């Protein structure tokens, strides 16, 4: 995928999420039950943790270093998500929202630094992709997986809850 298409996909999902968050408002972001017992705030903290790890991983690769996140790169999905939840459960919704969008801004800026060739040539990026993803794949797929595709996984739960709660959404 070309850089421009990757950025467009990321910005499109970001806009959808921003619309949902505006409809929810800070006062309702702590209400549990959006997805299991998780609140909107919890889901955002979860997304931000993965985006943050992606940002650090990309920054390290630009500096010629391999980065493996010792929490988010462990194979047990439930364990790593539990750690993310415990780490963030006492943070305010305002703090999480602010951090989330700041992290997305950083991610977009980092994506701009990569060429289309770097994003699509699995050979040239294998040195830092394989240690984190355990397989050779195009860099854009790694970025998509932990950013806009991850938002796409969680947006339906938020939208469903909003539809149930707000007749004007």
Protein language model regions, located:
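Hydrophobic packing residues in well-ordered alpha-helices of helical domains and bundles
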Residues: 7-10, 93-100, 144-147
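Short, contiguous alpha-helical
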Residues: 30-79, 122-169
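Extreme N-terminal tail/first-helix region
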Residues: 1-16
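A short, mixed-charge helix-start or loop-turn motif at secondary-structure junctions
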Residues: 3, 86-90, 136-140
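Structural signal for well-ordered, non-membrane alpha-helices
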Residues: 14-25, 51-55, 59, 101-115, ...
